[in-house]
Swiss-Prot record:
This is X polypeptide. The lineage of its organism: Bacteria, Pseudomonadati, Pseudomonadota, Gammaproteobacteria, Enterobacterales. The keyword Glycoprotein does not apply. The gene is X. The keyword rRNA-binding does not apply. Belongs to the IagB/IpgF/P19 family.
Amino acid sequence: MKKWMLAICLMFINGICEAADCFDLAGRDYKIDPDLLRAISWKESRYRVNAIGINPVTGYGSGLMQVDSQHFNELARYGIKPEHLTTDPCMNIYTGAYYLAIAFKKWGVSWEAVGAYNAGFRKTERQNQRRLAYASEVYRIYTWIKSSKGIRVPTTKKSLSQINSVQKN
């Protein structure tokens, strides 16, 4: 179902994105806090649309959300080419949100799942440490984004869903 949603969203994305913030749109469509998507994008690319990052294990990451080249075969089934990810910011943000939603579905809405966006799902101590380090940095960026908007984020080790519910009250 989510794969069909991704395909449909991506077909209409170009026209929509000219008038709205793609982080907000992708967040709405995937039920992910747009500021979390912004934090991940800052961590991954410093908001550089055409960023290319080398990944010694799987190849390279592309664009704002550093979508990994290991996903290119799957994305090709939806008509998404690697060059789209570095030239179409909205497509890149939606694609990153799609893969984050997969992590949330697999591990729940948690910081561990945020870490898996970057470090994968392998259950080894090394990957656990990589997930923790990545999620900690994203959390720091996320709290900075929220504080710049006057929103206080709890400093306890709450899950993302608990933090999001606090912010909506």
